[in-house]
C-alpha cells in the first residue's frame, strides 16, 4: 500500500512547482550554545515542468471549490488544491491536499476490523461520511497551522494563460469556467453546448456519485511536506 507520508510527498512535488524534495523530520541539529552540529539537506530533483505542475494545481483547486473536497476549504481563504479518495463501501477515506505553504495527507480507515478465530480479518467498518470526513479532518488541522499566515495564491509560471471553457465538452465559452493552460495547448474551438448540464444530466450524475465511490489514485510522484 501507499502511506500518507508517501502521498503527501507526491503531492508536494506539485506544490513545489514540479520539484520533488525528500521528506525530512528535521532540518538542523545545534548545540546548547547555538553551534551547528548537523545540517540536513534533503535530496531534491525536478520531476515535471513547472507549467504542468501548475495546470494540475489549477485542476485540483476545483476539487475543493466546486467538487468532492469542499470541506477541506480553509476559513481564511488561503487556496487549497487536493483530491479525495475512497474505496468500495468507504472502507478507506483519503484527502491529500496542499496550499502555497504546506502539504498534508489524511487517511481514515478501520485497520483492525472483525477477525475470525484464526485472527484473519473477515470484515472492516466503513468510514462515516467517506472522503468528506477525511477532508474535514484535513481542514481542521490546517486551519490551525495557517491561522496567522497571509492569504496568497499559488505562483503562476510565465507560460501559463487562462481561458474560459465549457466543462461539458472542453470547448471555449465566454460563460464557462476559467481554466489554466500551457501556451499553445488550449482549446481552439468554441463550444456549442450550454455551459451547465441540464437538470436530467445533473440528476444522473448525482445518482452515479451516490452509488459509485471514487477510487483513490496515486499521483505520479508529484509537495514535499514541511515538518
Sequence positions of predicted segments:
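A penicillin-recognizing enzyme superfamily signal
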Residues: 1-192
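Proline/serine/threonine-rich low-complexity "mucin-like" segments in extracytoplasmic/periplasmic regions
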Residues: 178-227
